[in-house]
Swiss-Prot record:
Channel that opens in response to stretch forces in the membrane lipid bilayer. May participate in the regulation of osmotic pressure changes within the cell. Pfam families: MscL. Homopentamer. This is Large-conductance mechanosensitive channel. PANTHER family: LARGE-CONDUCTANCE MECHANOSENSITIVE CHANNEL, MECHANOSENSITIVE CHANNEL MSCL. It comes from Lactobacillus helveticus (strain DPC 4571). GO terms for molecular function: mechanosensitive monoatomic ion channel activity.
Amino acid sequence: MLKEFKQFIARGNVIDLAVGVIIGAAFTAIVQSLVKNLINPLIGLFIGRIDLSNLTLKVGEANFRYGSFLNSIINFLIISFIVFLIVKAVNKFTKKEEEETPAAPTETDYLKEIRDLLKEKRSIK
């Protein structure tokens, strides 16, 4: 069982996934810093408050922290857009690679070639 686990872990997909998760976590920290330190102050200039995370709505005893929710939305939109750009670039690269690789002959192609050779052989006789 341990041997199977080692084989599973050593497969490329699992290692790629692990690297992706680690890079994603680091990237999330960068985006959160971008939102907190650059984007929120810019938005704050227009609404008169620098720190959006402190925006709240008090209804009775309930305190709704919609500013933190806005920060999360901004983080999500930035991360989603960058992931979209990465996927788009990867798809473009993969598509070019597929176009450059000539298609291998199919079974039908081989059968047509055999048929043509047989016709040619019969016409020679």
